[in-house]
Amino acid sequence: MNSKQILSLSAFAMTIATAAAGNWNAGDTIALLIGIAMFFVLLLALLGWISRKK
């Protein structure tokens, strides 16, 4: 799997997870934002690691 497939699969999984939640409150919103931020940081770390390997 390349990085584009992983990114699209992760975005799809986040969409399904948010659509499945029935009652949405502030805690869920904060958790979603933290999860997106962590995913973004990990994605950049992975891209940096790959670029240093080459």
Curated annotation (Swiss-Prot):
Residue spans, topological domain Cytoplasmic: 51-54
Q: Which UniProt keyword terms apply here? A: Membrane, Signal, Transmembrane, Transmembrane helix
Q: Does the keyword Membrane apply?
A: yes
According to the UniProt record, one GO cellular component term is: membrane
Transmembrane segments annotated in the record for this chain = 30-50
Q: Which domain of life is it from?
A: Eukaryota
Is Transmembrane helix among this UniProt entry's keywords? yes
Identify the stretch annotated as signal peptide in this record.
Answer: 1-21
Q: Which intervals lie on the Extracellular side per UniProt?
A: 22-29
> Where is this chain's protein located in or outside the cell?
Membrane
How does the protein associate with the membrane?
Single-pass type I membrane protein
Q: In its UniProt entry, what is this protein called?
A: Uncharacterized transmembrane protein DDB_G0282757
Originating organism: Dictyostelium discoideum (Social amoeba)
